[in-house]
């Protein structure tokens, strides 16, 4: 069964190491993704928040790398820009690649930059990484209670108008609830877990999970070890998060978001390991329909509802 993976940091790693997506030294490449049953992949553009011009240059280098890899590996990949791309028969044996921006420092406060990145192929965006920027507070700002700025609210409206998926991973708790108020389409939290099972700031509280469900959203359960369990995280611990969240808000709101190449410590070592997810979910009592929803159906629903 094909899988949608909602987050990997492979593009920035490829640029840093001057490596290829076909095969490389990281946690994710085409050869292993095919073994791992990946059908659709969100590829993050990410640069550590620094000088705005430095960030923009680095993000644009990653956009260029994305297009190079799509062109050089056209037998295996296609650029996913609309839902229809995901279901075309000629794409059935390829990986659909959706371009995502992790942290909007490259956008700044210029609304035209949102439209420009859309023209460059961007279809998903998180307003922040961990830090505060001109649009919102990130999760590392602690108890500042800072949410969205006025410009952040305007950016959300522009994203909705264009058809760009909103990702609320990394945003502050106040920003999370602000975003649900000002973005009028279903949202994603592309890589996070349940804070009730692992008390990490990047994980979602029960109230956040319930709010996500009320807005028709989807969370990508992630296998970064420190988000799964304080120490000694295993596959069973990862599956515990799936079970907890589906029990709390329903199976229709759960997917997977690996964060491959974003952390050295993973429950699943590399993307090949995704091949065990279907069987693992079955072992926890999920039926075939529910497994398909978790592995691809829920994420594809958001893509269908948001992308134009």
Question: Where is each model-derived feature located?
Answer:
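Conserved active-site loop/cleft motifs that coordinate metal ions or position small ligands
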Residues: 42, 220, 254-257, 292-295
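A short, acidic, flexible beta-alpha connecting loop/helix-capping segment that sits on the rim
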Residues: 46-48, 262, 295-301
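Soluble non-cytosolic domains of exported or imported proteins
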Residues: 24, 236, 268-272
């Amino acid at each position: 069964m094909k899988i949608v993976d909602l987050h990997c940091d492979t593009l920035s790693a490829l640029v840093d190491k001057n490596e290829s997506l076909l095969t490389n030294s990281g946690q994710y490449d085409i050869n292993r993704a095919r073994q791992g049953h990946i059908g659709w992949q969100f590829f993050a553009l990410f640069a550590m928040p620094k000088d705005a011009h430095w960030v923009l240059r680095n993000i644009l280098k990653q956009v260029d790398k994305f297009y190079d890899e799509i062109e050089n590996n056209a037998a295996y990949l296609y650029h996913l820009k609309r839902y229809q791309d995901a279901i075309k028969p000629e794409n059935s044996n390829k990986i659909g690649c959706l371009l995502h921006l992790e942290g909007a420092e490259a956008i700044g406060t210029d609304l035209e930059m949102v439209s420009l990145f859309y023209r460059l192929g961007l279809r998903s965006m998180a307003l922040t990484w961990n830090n505060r920027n001109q649009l919102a507070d990130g999760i590392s700002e602690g108890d500042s209670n800072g949410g969205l700025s006025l410009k952040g609210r305007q950016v959300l409206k522009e994203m909705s108008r264009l058809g760009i998926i909103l990702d609320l991973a990394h945003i502050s708790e106040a920003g999370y609830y602000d975003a649900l108020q000002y973005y009028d389409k279903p949202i994603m939290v592309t890589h996070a877990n349940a804070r009730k099972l692992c008390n990490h700031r990047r994980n979602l509280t029960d109230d956040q999970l319930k709010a996500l469900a009320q807005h028709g959203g989807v969370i990508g359960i992630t296998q970064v070890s420190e988000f799964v369990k304080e120490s000694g995280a295993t596959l069973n611990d990862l599956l515990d998060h799936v079970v907890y969240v589906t029990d709390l808000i329903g199976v229709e709101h759960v997917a997977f978001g690996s964060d491959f190449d974003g952390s050295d410590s993973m429950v699943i070592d590399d993307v090949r390991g995704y091949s065990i997810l279907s069987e693992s979910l079955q072992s926890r009592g999920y039926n075939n329909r529910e497994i398909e929803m978790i592995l691809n159906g829920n994420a594809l629903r958001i893509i269908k509802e948001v992308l134009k």
